Amino acid sequence: DLRKRGIRVLPGGDYGFKWNPHGRNARDLQMFVELFGFSPLEAIQAATQAGGELMGEPGRLGVITQGAFADLLLVDGDPSKDIAILQDPDRFLAIMKDGAFHKEPADNLAGQRVAAE
């Protein structure tokens, strides 16, 4: 196992082709869980935090902190328990790229969450 030897393993691939279109990288995270023994949270961290470190932007890319790039996905559910949630666009509640919403959360989203709990 590469990880046991201290080698970082990150998801990624050649996207943008007919047989592997953009937007399918969440499928790779599920493969990391099912085939490589990652927990869902480890797969998410490999794709985000470790990816930011690999790209030379530790602390700014792949993390949620003040001063970091604001690229966020808010989903209905807990992907740390069920990684497949990230493959279901119907569960995407909000999408933010560079601090701008590409899909804004519903106005009543917070109220629905509080009422459900």
Task: Place the predicted regions along the sequence by residue.
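Short, solvent-exposed mixed-charge patches
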Residues: 116-117
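C-terminal cap of metal-dependent C-N hydrolases
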Residues: 49, 66-112
